[in-house]
A protein has these predicted regions:
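Short cysteine-rich clusters marking metal-coordination/redox-active sites
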Residues: 126-129, 148-151
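Short linker/helix segments within small regulatory modules
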Residues: 137-145
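Cys/His-rich microdomains that often coordinate metals
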Residues: 130-133, 155
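Conserved small/polar residues in nucleotide/adenosyl-binding loops
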Residues: 204-211
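Ampiphathic alpha-helical segments that act as solvent-exposed interaction surfaces
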Residues: 67-76, 85-122
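Short, non-helical or kinked segments that cap or interrupt transmembrane helices
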Residues: 195-203
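Cytosolic-side membrane-insertion boundary helix
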Residues: 154-176
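Short Lys/Arg-enriched alpha/beta "domain-start" segment
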Residues: 1-73
């Protein structure tokens, strides 16, 4: 499937799910039952095999047990797996053959996921600080985040600082290499000039005096 056709199909999926399609980022994002979702295809070879990503925390700070996860995965034939890491919730969906089936799968999985989270007293939150505030979807450094305005500002600032430090380190390394090369060249030039003037000295050991 060529890129133009893929974009057209993704736009149809967006219309059918109420999500927004970001053509530049190649992902969908939007809200369902108060939860901020990012939806993307992790493998370009399978454009209709999606992953749902959101951030949520339980009322008591606990995580899902294996039995609850197993029950959720069995609740829908469209769900392949469920993953939880800290505040990250990821739901992998089974691959579909076309845009229409992908749209139906997304609607079913989004509804099932929000119901599962709400039933287990989970609420939407910021990926970093964990506060129950409005968040926005972001992709930085190949990772996906749901960030509140304060954490977004902090993350952007940290990235800018690291980028600046990396650039400075590069400049220092280049400067050191150039300095070493110049020093070496100047040393060779000095030896050459001195040798032309007859000032190159040789170190030698004088012979011991004979008795």
């Amino acid at each position: 499937m060529n890129q133009k056709k893929k974009i057209e199909n993704y736009q149809q999926i967006a219309m059918g799910t109420g999500l927004r399609y970001d053509e530049v980022g190649g992902l969908f994002h939007g809200e369902r039952d108060g939860f901020d979702f990012i939806v993307y295809a992790p493998d370009a070879r399978y454009p209709y095999m999606m992953v749902l990503h959101t951030a949520a925390k339980s009322a008591d700070g606990s995580t899902f047990d294996k039995q609850a996860v197993k029950g959720f995965q069995k609740s829908s034939k469209k769900i392949a797996s469920f993953g939880q890491k800290n505040l990250d919730i990821r739901v992998s969906l089974k691959a579909q053959s076309n845009a229409e089936k992908c749209k139906d799968t997304l609607n079913e999985a989004l509804a099932a996921t929000t119901t599962f989270l709400r039933t287990n007293s989970y609420s939407p939150c910021c990926d970093l600080c964990g506060q129950n505030v409005e968040t926005g979807a972001f992709r930085m450094g190949g990772e996906y985040y749901h960030l509140c305005p304060d954490c977004e500002t902090k993350m952007r600032s940290d990235i800018a600082m690291k980028t600046q430090q990396k650039a400075q380190k590069k400049e220092n390394i280049v400067g050191g290499i150039v300095g070493a090369l110049l020093g070496s060249l100047l040393g060779m030039l000095s030896v050459l000039i001195l040798s032309q003037l007859g000032y190159v000295c040789l170190l030698y050991t004088s012979p011991s005096p004979r008795d």
